Amino acid sequence: MDAAAAPEFTEEALEAGRLLFAGKAEFVMGVVSLSGLPPADRSEVCFAGRSNVGKSSLINALTGRAKLARSSAEPGRTRELNYFDIGDEGKLYLVDLPGFGYAKVSKTQTAAWTKLIKSYLRGRPSLRRVFLLVDARRGDLMDTDEEVMDLMDGAAVTYQVVLTKVDKVPKGEVEKIVVKIADKLKKRGAAHPVVRMTSAEKGFGIPELRAEIAALAMLG
């Protein structure tokens, strides 16, 4: 499948996505160790990405709640796996992973986060997909993105690249970026072939990402 030409969703799929995120959306807990994880009793998806990639803004756009996920005033300060309960009747956990790649974070902190994230990715049976957020303004994957992909390939955890802030880049350039990244994903065993394009500020790509996540929530 050509990732530059992502398949269209049916009206039913888009409506399922709308309904899921129109329901309950609550912060549940921040987890600092595997012993603190909630029961794996529903599907989980998680958002990963470099610090300041726009994870909090995207979560808020998906849920339609401006302050559900709060970005830290200082990049790299989020040290927890933040769990959000999405949808009525406990349908889905959305997990916001700590941002990576921020230079001012100490090596000790980085090592601790990395260990926690590795353990989570390898040992969470209810994890359906990791959405790896990439700032479109970067123009390509960063080395740290590729390192996280290596980790997920090794753990056999399916992941999908989501471009953020595409409204900040000319349309023609965004399409070139998608093609470039999609070509790299073809060489990776655990990568989903479709690169999603989003803008939390403009709402672009939000209905489609909701539909994508809703389909995963139905896996139970």
From Swiss-Prot:
Gene Ontology process terms (BP): division septum assembly
Record-given protein name: Probable GTP-binding protein EngB
Superkingdom of this protein's organism: Bacteria
Its biological purpose: Necessary for normal cell division and for the maintenance of normal septation.
Naturally occurring in which organism (per UniProt): Hyphomonas neptunium (strain ATCC 15444)
Disulfide bond annotation, renumbered to this chain: none
Annotated GO MF terms: GTP binding; metal ion binding
Sites where the protein binds GTP: 49-56, 76-80, 96-99, 164-167, 197-200
Cofactor(s) of this protein: Mg(2+)
Gene3D superfamilies, alphabetized: P-loop containing nucleotide triphosphate hydrolases (3.40.50.300)
Entry binding sites for Mg(2+): S56, T78
Record key words, sorted: Cell cycle, Cell division, GTP-binding, Magnesium, Metal-binding, Nucleotide-binding, Septation
SUPFAM superfamilies noted in UniProt: P-loop containing nucleoside triphosphate hydrolases
Domain EngB-type G: 41-219
Recorded family membership: Belongs to the TRAFAC class TrmE-Era-EngA-EngB-Septin-like GTPase superfamily. EngB GTPase family.
Pfam families found in the cross-reference section: MMR_HSR1
